């Protein structure tokens, strides 16, 4: 039996075309592309502005059920579907997020797809790429430095150092930095205070970059950032410290979407990268809107399960950007359904139809949740070698009882040839006119009510609890004019509840909101639930231990 090639081996053997040829497919002139080598480029702001009057293509969201730690192939399916649509004659563009170094060296691995459904250059995309994350980290930490510098030189804004909310960031999983004391070592180093680090993908600057429509909007949003509060409890904004202009300068190039290609030489935008469990989990509005002007179909993904990424895609990204999705694909795997049915991780390769049927309750809830937003749904069964015919048949039968269709997809092994059936179904749904998109809640209800609606309608929680301090903080923000903002739930990705071990489709559980953060620049309120951390830690045996350069200087073990 021939050995199965790793993702990195497949990507390395790709017959890539020069990036200018990929741009030409979309009608992007050579002079409007800023090349980063031969296989990746940024699209100029001038070109993007010139597309404003064009008609939009169809927008397709790819989401998933609650995943196993390794993920269920959502990005792989997004890339495969883009290739599949091109294969059947549609002009399709893939829009995905950039990879964070945290999961790359942690537990999940890369974020460029897998098998024969990848975007390339895979190694670059998973590592430093075009430097966007560096720019975001630098802009975020510039503001942090300017806060402490302002206090050191007299604190003209009367910032209460006990109420500084702006933390520092880095693009790495490092639990040791979650809580720290800075400015120790004497008067020359400033005023000691407690702070900490978040991972870059949880940064409000990341969210701002992904939601801003142009450089003017970017700078306005950066200025709106609240870094803390004065002694009189009034908010201090980044523009009060004159930091917004310099931050925008650092982000000027990062605002331009990155163009790359799939293994089948189809165009893909890879831009922005907020996590969906601790941020809003969607690629940039700029990339999505640009792709909609250039293609007949745009296939994008939102992180983790539909309870997180899809809800935020609909309630934050689509609401803020005026987007109206035409269809949604929910990725399910036999192994994840069995895990949601109670099967242990080590036993997922063994046939267990009974457990799978039990776990299908998780899939059923995700289908119902997406339909709640008025978007038609198809289920993609991402095929794994260990799947049996009986298990696949059980999934198809379950989904058919929901009035939807489940389609077996083999894009990981076969590329676009393995996903043609799904591509045809997506076209059918998108062209049917069934989509009647609407957000889950209106702007005018209270912030706590918005949290309760997401928890009850999407998570099926019986109750939302929060300390008086949390409720009072939400009320204060409402009084300050932030009551119309949507909420961004920070929650475990492994369950509908806040308990990662509670699988399936739990009912009546309690969602505890332990902290809330106002992202005034991004335009949402983050509600942190359960034990979720905005700075992850590395697992006992991180992926980094298995990544190295071989004797030829090639990267091994990345994915």
From Swiss-Prot:
It catalyses: (6S)-5,6,7,8-tetrahydrofolate + formate + ATP = (6R)-10-formyltetrahydrofolate + ADP + phosphate. Keywords: ATP-binding, Ligase, Nucleotide-binding, One-carbon metabolism. Pfam families: FTHFS (PF01268). Pathway: One-carbon metabolism; tetrahydrofolate interconversion. Its EC number is 6.3.4.3. GO terms for biological process: tetrahydrofolate interconversion. InterPro entries: Formate_THF_ligase (IPR000559), Formate_THF_ligase_CS (IPR020628), P-loop_NTPase (IPR027417). ATP binds at residues 68-75. One of its GO terms (molecular function) is ATP binding. Belongs to the formate--tetrahydrofolate ligase family. This is Formate--tetrahydrofolate ligase. It comes from Rhizobium leguminosarum bv. trifolii (strain WSM2304).
